A protein has these predicted regions:
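Sec-dependent N-terminal signal peptides
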Residues: 4-14
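Bacterial Sec-dependent signal peptides at the C-terminal "C-region" and cleavage site
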Residues: 15-19
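Subset of outer-membrane beta-barrel
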Residues: 20-275
């Protein structure tokens, strides 16, 4: 009985607060900057906006983990692999949200290419798997993501991203449609060491979310980051450090209603291919 009550409670919490977590932001860098992601060029673009990995030139492997509100049932895991080739960049990714009796899983294959500094495009194909518990049939769906980025100047980048534009349907009793997510934003290098970012996200299941983030490179390999976003009202901060070929990022965020979440991520730079 207690197990069933816990399951029902978590399901209601997930649907009301997160409205599915299929397009959740991966990587502590973005998490620390108010969940900003759409105009960044980094490893976790493979999850957040595939266009951002178009210029990524290092074979890399990464993992991230988020503990939300000190509840293991709301854990969020990400893993990804990025492979640059002569004609673009490929990426593989996996994410999982939830726990044994309820979890959302996303498997992705991405490709991005820079046609010029002014046009970078990325496409990602997703296979979605939902596990409710042993008493229910697993639910599956397929969708895709598109990203565009443009470096207007050496200091200014504009990004656009859309998840699930065809409003994929999950075959259940009520034929639930998964949300469409659209992001638009820009990043601006105020100086070579200081980055300012802003972004708006539309989710067909929620109100608009406005995001603002700052990143400061205090030392050669050390970064400090802060950010806020509005839905729900959340403040965040974090730090990042590059140790040889390993990038270590940690962050924390405070939601006004539900409390503190922590995220950490590791990126391993394996090799720079001869392209």
């Amino acid at each position: 009985m207690k197990r069933n009550l816990l399951l029902i409670g978590v399901l209601l919490f997930c649907n009301q607060c997160f409205s599915w977590d299929l397009s959740g932001i991966a990587g502590s860098r973005s998490n620390a900057m108010g969940n900003f992601s759409v105009a960044l060029h980094d490893f976790w673009s493979v999850q957040n906006d595939p266009a951002g990995m178009a210029d990524f030139r290092t074979i890399s492997l990464g993992f991230s983990y988020e503990n939300r509100f000190f509840m293991k049932e709301l854990s969020y895991y990400n893993g990804a692999f990025v492979l640059p080739v002569n004609f673009g960049t490929f990426g593989l990714s996996f994410s999982r949200f939830g726990f044994e009796n309820y979890n959302e899983n996303k498997f992705g294959l991405a490709f991005a290419r820079a046609f010029s500094p002014y046009l970078k495009m990325g496409l990602k194909l997703d296979y979605l798997l939902f596990n409710f518990n042993d008493d229910y049939e697993k639910k599956k769906a397929a969708t895709f993501e598109l990203g565009l980025q443009s470096d207007i100047t050496d200091n200014l980048c504009i990004g656009v991203y859309i998840f699930n534009p065809h409003h994929a349907k999950l075959k259940t009793l009520h034929n639930i449609r998964l949300p469409v997510v659209f992001r638009f934003g820009l990043s601006y290098k105020v100086t070579k060491d200081f980055l300012a970012c802003t972004e708006a996200e539309y989710n067909s299941d929620k109100s608009l979310d406005y995001r603002f983030g700052l990143e400061y490179n205090t030392l050669k390999e050390f970064y400090i980051r802060v950010g806020v976003h509005t839905n729900p009202a959340t403040a965040s901060f974090g730090v990042g450090y590059t140790l040889h070929r390993v990038i270590i990022d940690v962050s924390a965020s405070m939601d006004q209603h539900t409390g503190v979440s922590f995220q950490s991520s590791l990126i391993f730079k394996i090799k720079e291919p001869n392209l």
